[in-house]
Each structure stands twice: as C-alpha cells, then as structure tokens.
Curated annotation (Swiss-Prot):
The active site is at residue 128. GO terms for cellular component: 6-phosphofructokinase complex. It comes from Buchnera aphidicola subsp. Schizaphis graminum (strain Sg). It is found in: Cytoplasm. Gene3D superfamilies: 3.40.50.450, Phosphofructokinase domain (3.40.50.460). It is an enzyme of class 2 (transferase). This is ATP-dependent 6-phosphofructokinase. Catalyzes the phosphorylation of D-fructose 6-phosphate to fructose 1,6-bisphosphate by ATP, the first committing step of glycolysis.
Length: 320
C-alpha cells in the first residue's frame, strides 16, 4: 500500500502541466497520501531536489502555463548508475511511487524506474501530440490555438502584400499539430513528415494557384523537414512572388492552457493517482473517445508512430 508519491515534469514543457500536477496533488491528498514535488524532472530527482506539497502549493495553478516544478532534458538518466542514485533518493524519503508527466523520453525514464522497483504512471504532456495510447496529449489544444492565431495574423499581412508565407510548426516527426492548424487557419498548402515532400511539386502547386488568380498563400510545414528560409528563397525565385518564412518556435509551448487542456490534465492527473492506489505500475494514461484509459508504457513505446490522419489531409486539399 502506497503512502507517499512523487510527481515530476520532464522534457519539453506544455500548457496544462500545472493543471496535471494539481490533479495529482489534490487527488492524492484526498486519499490521505503525501505528495512530493520533484524539481526539474529527472535531473532534480538525481540531485535530490524535492519538496513536500500541500493543497495550497497548487492553488491558482490550473490556469498557468509552463510547469512550476520546472522541467529539464537529462540524457544522463539513461545511465544505470545515475538512476540508482535517483532511486536511493526516493527510498531515503520513503516515496513509494512516481507520476511522470512528459513525452516519450519521459516514458522511457518511467519504464526504467519501474523495472528498478519504483512503480511509475506516466501522463502524456507534449504539444506535439506524438505519444501513443491517447487521442490527445496535454498542451496540444493550447498550442493549436496559438498556431492558428499566428496563421490568422500572417494571412492579414500576406493578403496586404500579395505575399507567400511559410509558417513552420512544431511537432517533431508528427504532423498532427500542423495539419489541424492548417485546416483551421485555411492554409493553401501543407507539408507534413508523414507525406513525401518535393519542393518542386510544392512550387508547381503554388504556381498553379497563382495562375488561377490567387493573390497570396500560406504554406504550413512541420519542423525538421527542411530549412524554411532556404525554401522561401527557392519559392520566391521560381514564382517571382515575395515569400517569407516564419518560425513560430517556443511561443507554441507558452500561454495559459485552454479549457480542454485544463480538463484533460485534471482528469489525467487524478486517474494516474487512482491507478497507483489500485496497484498498477509501468502504465501510461490516455484519453480515447473521451474516456480515461491506460496502457503498458512498454507497449506505448513500441508503437509511438501515430496513425496518420489521411482523411484530414484529403479534406484539407479539397479546401485549398
């Protein structure tokens, strides 16, 4: 029977992480458990930086972006000797289990800790929406709002100057955020990691639009596919139309979480604690068809490539 749990946020931050921490803390306290907040993810766990949390520790946190516990990427956690120190730090405080909030890298850490005797439950927190076992991740919908707002603003100035605008969106190797934002923002062209990309074909499509009388256009592209500044110069040279690239960058991770992310994070935080109380370990929570679900972390890590929303792309192309 667990009496003390720890909670940490790891990897890239996402709007709604504070709401998830709040869900963990308030649910645990309602079940008479003690909760320790661990600062800066696995790095703080290794450095033994943690503090006891009460219900007031998470007051006024549900609407705040970022994570008040802090987050960090800590590649050293892959080393067994580093994890052994982390486990010893937990044992010294008699912390029985952990809730880990983050993306696939955070899942790997939770998987390894579980194998070392620390029961872990993972919560998907990333704007990329690239984690298996869930329809949506915490932060995705807030980032989507941010991206669409940026696209709306770009459309205003692109229209004024009859310009082609390229907007680079986060997502790593998953195009969910780009695709949804492109549909909501009315983008004329979409470049995703899930589809074959040739700049020559993109230029041909843009040129065809110009010949039909299109005065401006917005191209939404997922990060890491190409150098968007070079792509902008290439398009401008081939079309003789002013072209500018905008990299949204880390602004996509900031801001107060939207309503859906607050609810999702609260539900996931509470559910993670419930699973620990029931004796589960090495699991990751998710939402599927609006219901809370859980899967083995190991299975999720084996199937991280999400099913591509091909029907969404087909719809988007009809709306160009």
């Amino acid at each position: 029977m667990i009496k003390k749990i720890g909670v940490l946020t790891s990897g890239g931050d996402a709007p709604g992480m504070n709401a998830a921490i709040r869900g963990v803390v308030r649910t645990a306290l309602s079940e008479k458990l003690e909760v320790f907040g661990i600062y800066d993810g696995y790095l703080g766990l290794y450095e033994n930086r943690m503090t006891l949390l009460d219900r007031y520790s998470v007051s006024d946190m549900i609407n705040r972006g970022g994570t008040f516990l802090g987050s960090a990427r800590f590649p050293g956690f892959y080393k067994n000797e580093i994890r052994t120190i982390a486990v010893n730090n937990l044992n010294k405080r008699n912390i029985d289990a952990l809730v880990v909030i983050g993306g696939d890298g955070s899942y790997i850490g939770a998987q390894k800790l579980t194998k070392m005797g620390i029961p872990c439950i993972s919560i998907p927190g990333t704007i990329d929406n690239d984690v298996a076992g869930t329809d949506y991740t915490i932060g995705y919908f807030t980032a989507l709002e941010t991206v669409v707002e940026a696209i709306d603003r770009l459309r205003d100035t692109s229209s004024s100057h009859q310009r082609i605008s390229i907007v680079e969106v986060m997502g790593r190797y998953c195009g969910d955020l780009t695709l949804a934002a492109a549909i909501a923002g009315g983008c004329e062209f979409i470049v995703l990691p899930e589809i074959h990309y040739k700049k020559e074909e993109l230029v041909s499509e843009i040129q065809a639009g110009i010949e039909k009388g299109k005065k401006h256009a917005i191209v939404a592209i997922t990060e890491y596919i190409c150098d968007v500044e070079k792509l902008a110069k290439y398009i401008e040279k081939k079309t003789n139309r002013e072209t500018r690239a905008t990299i949204l960058g880390h602004i996509q991770r900031g801001g107060a979480p939207v309503v859906y992310d607050r609810i999702l994070a609260s539900r996931m935080g509470a559910y993670a604690v419930e699973l620990l109380i029931e004796g589960y370990k090495g699991k990751c929570v998710g939402i599927q068809n609006e219901k809370m679900v859980f899967n083995d972390i190991t299975d999720a890590l084996k199937n991280m490539k999400r099913v591509f929303k091909k029907d969404w792309l087909i719809t988007a192309k009809k709306l160009y």
